[in-house]
């Protein structure tokens, strides 16, 4: 399953909110855009584990200090959207799709496409 990449205007607004107001407000903006419940951002490296820098569980995305960046936030947002919509897919496929989603959102915004 693929989640549609927002329009350039929405992507630019996300980046602006992220830079000026922080990642939680930016994620709130995108969850409103997609019409799903809010995903909470938690900066707590102890909850992450397994050498990962971020993880998603039950409407919360946990990040280490090192892992809190736009790309990882968008990656975990994909997991949230898949969870809320009840999509069933293999862990590997979901990880690949989450990476692809984050890359497309950032590349299309920063690359002026």
What are these model-derived regions, one by one?
Residues 2-66:
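Auxiliary, metal-adjacent structural segments of Zn-dependent hydrolase domains
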Residues 56-73, 86-89, 93:
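Short pre-active-site segment immediately N-terminal to the catalytic Zn-binding motif
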Residues 70, 77, 112-113:
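Polar low-complexity intrinsically disordered regions
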Residues 73-85, 97, 101:
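Active-site His/Glu-centered metal-binding helix of metallohydrolases
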Residues 91-113:
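Post-HExxH zinc-binding segment in Zn-dependent metallohydrolases
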